[in-house]
Amino acid sequence: MKVTDKKIEGCQASITVEMDSTEVEEGLSKTYRRLVKKVEIPGFRKGKAPRDVFEKYVSREKMLDELVDDIVPEACQKAIQDEEIKPFATPKVAMVTTDPFVFSARIPLPPVVELGDYKTIRATKETVEIAEENIDTVVDQVLHQRATWETAERPVKMGDMLLMQVESTLNGEPYLNREDMQYSVREEAIYPAPGFGGYLVDMVAGEPKEFSIVFPEDHARAELAGKTAAFKVTVREIKEEKLPELNDAFAHELNPEFNTLSELRQRIRENMQDRQDDKAQAKFEDQIVEALIKMSKIDYPEVMVEAELDQIIEQQLQRLQSNVKSPEEFRAMLSQMTPEDMQQRYRPLAEQRVASSLALGKLATTENLVPNDEEVDAEIEKLITDAGDKKEEEKALYNQPETRGRLIQLLTARKTMAFIDEIALQPALEAVESKADEDEKTEEADK
């Protein structure tokens, strides 16, 4: 066996290997012994046909094709060792020719990360003030959630809840036909057609109304675009929303912890502030990681992106499946996008995640941010604080190698982000240098 070609580009090595005739013959003998037990040959019991007869029966070309499974994996591994290549993942092997017996292998190599001067990274974290209007909006939402619905003896208004009979066609074909349909009259509603709610305003219970709506040419659902829906609607019942009175009693009923409406508003403010702070922190950290990646030299094998891409697509499919109402709807949505479309869509995200993971991982090892055993044990104690009688059982679970390993990764990521966050929040370098110059001038003037 000899390596006839070897190339290393970035994080991938490529080799071409030619097997000598002796190795091929030894391999063919092994292939013969494996296959002869499976193939029925006239005139011989299974497994007893001589090799020359067997080879004529199945053909030498077939034998050489089967030989690939018998000798290529081992030969590839030996060639990698002989060339002192350190693979990061399983090589991808392809046959070049079977006569002579030549194969090629693409071998992923470990990623390489050279960090930039990360101590110069600076970023600004947004501060968001919660306005009274924002709190008013949430309070209004809570009021509507606690509202009751009462029958109204009047024409339909926006915001009403209707019970109605609907008959309709779409370009003459049956469309939406319901005997008892509940419908919330909203100006922004687009179902069953854009502007449908507006046609219901001023209708009176018991009196039918007919109208038509043309779907816009650029409608999101192509099967509806440009078509005309003809409706006949009879309102059976009109209900109007009755909001509870907004006072201290309402706040206390909502949560016994609140004695006043002010306390409810304060809790809403705190919750909104927490969410906004979390968003600001996430945006801040995204800026930092992006800067770290941009200033660093990061090279990685394609297999890392492929693995991350597979995981992202799997997560998206699971999320999609959980949000649809039926398997048929799920299949219909899948039919609108090919695997290639999904790979193209999510590839940039996969590449960003790989680069981010490698850059932060390198930073963690450079600054020795991997937690020690004491830190991991302390975190486990926090996690099992509320476990009660099952503390020891929970502790044993967290100390299982795989679970403890994930916890170490989590703590490492947390410490690494805290480290780089602190750097990024320092004053801008220009300001620090300017201050140093001023101090130096002051000292000279004092002399």
Swiss-Prot record:
<dbReference type="GO" id="GO:0051083">
    <property type="term" value="P:'de novo' cotranslational protein folding"/>
</dbReference>
<keyword id="KW-0132">Cell division</keyword>
<dbReference type="GO" id="GO:0003755">
    <property type="term" value="F:peptidyl-prolyl cis-trans isomerase activity"/>
</dbReference>
<dbReference type="InterPro" id="IPR037041">
    <property type="entry name" value="Trigger_fac_C_sf"/>
</dbReference>
<dbReference type="InterPro" id="IPR046357">
    <property type="entry name" value="PPIase_dom_sf"/>
</dbReference>
<dbReference type="InterPro" id="IPR008880">
    <property type="entry name" value="Trigger_fac_C"/>
</dbReference>
<dbReference type="Pfam" id="PF05698">
    <property type="entry name" value="Trigger_C"/>
</dbReference>
<dbReference type="GO" id="GO:0005737">
    <property type="term" value="C:cytoplasm"/>
</dbReference>
<comment type="similarity">
    <text>Belongs to the FKBP-type PPIase family. Tig subfamily.</text>
</comment>
<keyword id="KW-0697">Rotamase</keyword>
<feature type="domain" description="PPIase FKBP-type">
    <location>
        <begin position="159"/>
        <end position="244"/>
    </location>
</feature>
<dbReference type="InterPro" id="IPR036611">
    <property type="entry name" value="Trigger_fac_ribosome-bd_sf"/>
</dbReference>
<keyword id="KW-0131">Cell cycle</keyword>
<dbReference type="InterPro" id="IPR005215">
    <property type="entry name" value="Trig_fac"/>
</dbReference>
<keyword id="KW-0413">Isomerase</keyword>
<protein>
    <recommendedName>
        <fullName>Trigger factor</fullName>
        <ecNumber>5.2.1.8</ecNumber>
    </recommendedName>
</protein>
<keyword id="KW-0963">Cytoplasm</keyword>
<dbReference type="GO" id="GO:0044183">
    <property type="term" value="F:protein folding chaperone"/>
</dbReference>
<dbReference type="GO" id="GO:0043022">
    <property type="term" value="F:ribosome binding"/>
</dbReference>
<dbReference type="GO" id="GO:0015031">
    <property type="term" value="P:protein transport"/>
</dbReference>
<dbReference type="GO" id="GO:0043335">
    <property type="term" value="P:protein unfolding"/>
</dbReference>
<comment type="function">
    <text>Involved in protein export. Acts as a chaperone by maintaining the newly synthesized protein in an open conformation. Functions as a peptidyl-prolyl cis-trans isomerase.</text>
</comment>
<dbReference type="Pfam" id="PF05697">
    <property type="entry name" value="Trigger_N"/>
</dbReference>
<dbReference type="InterPro" id="IPR008881">
    <property type="entry name" value="Trigger_fac_ribosome-bd_bac"/>
</dbReference>
<dbReference type="GO" id="GO:0051301">
    <property type="term" value="P:cell division"/>
</dbReference>
<keyword id="KW-0143">Chaperone</keyword>
<dbReference type="InterPro" id="IPR027304">
    <property type="entry name" value="Trigger_fact/SurA_dom_sf"/>
</dbReference>
<dbReference type="GO" id="GO:0061077">
    <property type="term" value="P:chaperone-mediated protein folding"/>
</dbReference>
